[in-house]
Amino acid sequence: MATDTAQAENQMESRRDFLFIATGAVAVLGTAAVIWPLIDQMAPDAATIAAGAPLDIDIGSLAAGQQIIVKWRGHPIFIVNRPPDALKILQDPALVGLLSDPNSQARQQPGYAYNWHRSLQPEFAVLVGICTHLGCIPTYEPNRNQLAPGWLGGWFCACHGSKYDLAGRVFRNVPAPYNLPVPPYRFINDKTIRIGENPTGEKFELDSVIQL
């Protein structure tokens, strides 16, 4: 009986670890403002999570500017619905000039994410949420001037000050050497992303990136 109870508690912990959500100026991971959605159909069982199997994520209710974080193969995966103004900023020469690898020359993404938005569809960013310096988890800071005057939105790693834009491209003069990795993923339909599976005809493994 005690064993059954412990197993149930462990499974619940795994499900709670699977998905959380933050919006607007709410920082992710490490604040008391994290909101836990009650979306059972999006939470796989513990065995699925542990196996690292492909993971289907419903993005139908993901509002513009909102981020969700899911857990795949033990890694936090950032999924963000980038609004039109954020996409314009990604192409702004004033921002591009501040980035270390604006054209994604380093192999930190699959071929189908080798573009200015580093994604299959411009609106949706899908990134491994691990700082390429020492493995901390950056916080989502999407709003202009939210982090500091002149900030245009992106992620900030509080461990050592590394910064990334809303495409996961790393800024110059920070400790992190590479852009945030893009995991293998594809769209099942307009409202569902499958993480861990490439589009038809594409080949990419997360282990092939330079820095995870």
Explain the meaning of each model-derived region:
Residues 1-13:
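N-terminal secretory signal peptides
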Residues 2-5, 36-37, 41-54, 60, ...:
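Conserved C-terminal region and hinge/linker of Rieske [2Fe-2S] proteins, especially
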Residues 12, 17, 21, 29-71, ...:
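C-terminal segment of N-terminal export signals and the immediately downstream linker at the start
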Residues 36, 72, 78, 164, ...:
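Aromatic side chains
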Residues 59, 72, 80-81, 128, ...:
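Pocket-edge structural micro-motifs
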